[in-house]
UniProtKB/Swiss-Prot annotation:
Annotated Gene Ontology cellular component terms: bacterial-type flagellum basal body, distal rod, P ring; outer membrane-bounded periplasmic space
Places the protein is found: Periplasm; Bacterial flagellum basal body
Alphabetized InterPro entries for the sequence: Flag_FlgI (IPR001782)
Keywords attached to this entry: Bacterial flagellum, Periplasm, Signal
Main location as per UniProt: periplasm
Quaternary structure annotation from Swiss-Prot or TrEMBL: The basal body constitutes a major portion of the flagellar organelle and consists of four rings (L,P,S, and M) mounted on a central rod.
Protein name: Flagellar P-ring protein
Species name: Campylobacter jejuni subsp. jejuni serotype O:6 (strain 81116 / NCTC 11828)
Length: 348
């Protein structure tokens, strides 16, 4: 079993980014949608008879087509009940396409190859904003032993829904324009205020706190013109390091310079020892990884004597041991809880 690990060189030095990369415009945001539907056409991998809600849903669907069937008489395993979720972007118009996520609710083994039937997607207000339907593909992943992160019971369908209802917006008439920083930071908020006031030659921005910058539009500009100019301005910025793990595909994305502090951690039968005082020579049964780390497959032990060990080193060594994505996720989460990783950890 192999885990796909990608190490990207994310520069941690200060560099220029546009304001739109570090801040959101308050009120301009996605809205969550959700719906309940059925996936049909599964080759015996759908919900069994223990999923009563699926049988009832099939019966209700057929009844709507003037076909009366008692739920207790339905024995098909080619159908699965699913929850469908999507994000409705700001300013989305009727007819726009949305990506959807389809997730099994019952005991289906796989959604691969099925078809999602017409599903209404509703907002928090209960109104229907989009309609979803389409073929399901889980990406061709095959299950791996040990819960290896292949989720054949969930899938993302690109462009699987059509927007049917728009969310009312009055952006052009809004006089209360505000930026909200994606990561709270007093220096970044102060830099945005300084840069914008300099560019426009008047006080158009005021940092309120570490996350909020209030804006005042010049009289000769429309809201759209003003925000277009605001969001394209460059500021000096130092990004927060991040480690991203895709639980479904087993992909790990990390900056090569995300360091891990000395720590001792045990997960199941895997032991990780990070200690600058470790023996710098490979012991019997150990494999020298040539980066200050040693792997002992016989005892599932990782030993690192490099004072500046990185997430990249550890993930590569765990791959060498054949660790599953679930194991890697659990280990990274425990390293984060122990304060050994100075980076944001995101599981997607």
């Amino acid at each position: 079993m192999r885990v796909l690990t990608i190490f990207l060189l994310f520069m941690t030095s200060i560099f220029a980014v546009q304001i739109k990369d570090v801040a959101n415009t308050v009120g301009v945001r996605d809205n969550q949608l959700i719906g309940y539907g059925l996936v049909v056409g599964l080759n015996g991998s759908g919900d069994g008879t223990s999923s009563k809600f699926t049988l009832q849903s099939i019966s209700n669907l057929l009844q709507g087509m003037n076909i009366k069937v008692d739920p207790n008489d339905i024995k098909s395993k080619n159908t699965a009940a699913v929850m469908v979720t999507a994000k409705l972007p700001a300013f989305a118009k009727s007819g726009d396409k949305l990506d959807i996520t389809v997730s099994s609710m019952g005991d289906a083994k796989s959604l691969q190859g099925g078809t999602l039937l017409l599903t209404a997607l509703r907002g928090i207000d209960g109104e229907i904003y989009a309609i979803a339907q389409g073929s399901i593909s889980t990406g061709g992943l095959t299950p791996r032993p040990g819960g290896a992160g292949s989720h054949s019971t969930a899938a993302t369908v690109m462009g699987g829904a059509n927007v049917e209802r728009e969310i009312p917006q009055n952006f052009s008439q809004n006089n209360d324009l505000t930026l909200s920083l994606k990561v709270a930071d007093f220096k970044t908020a102060n830099d945005i205020e300084r840069v914008l006031n300099t560019v426009f030659g008047e006080e158009v921005a005021k940092a309120i706190d570490s996350r909020t910058v209030k804006l005042k539009k010049p009289e000769d500009l429309s809201n759209v013109d003003f925000m277009a100019r605001v969001l394209e301005q460059d500021i000096a910025y130092k990004p927060q390091s991040k480690v991203i793990i895709d639980e479904r595909t087993g992909t790990v994305i990390a900056g090569v310079d995300v360091e891990v502090e000395p720590v001792l951690i045990t997960h199941k039968d895997i032991t990780i020892k990070i200690d600058p005082n470790n023996n710098a020579v490979a012991n019997q049964n150990e494999i020298d990884m040539k980066d200050g780390g040693f792997v002992d497959p016989s005892s599932n032990t990782l030993r690192i004597n490099n004072a500046k060990s990185t997430v990249a080193n550890i993930a590569r060594m765990l791959n060498k041991l054949g660790a599953t994505p679930n194991d890697i996720i659990a280990i990274m989460e425990n390293l984060k809880r122990a304060g050994a990783i100075n980076a944001d950890l995101e599981i997607i």
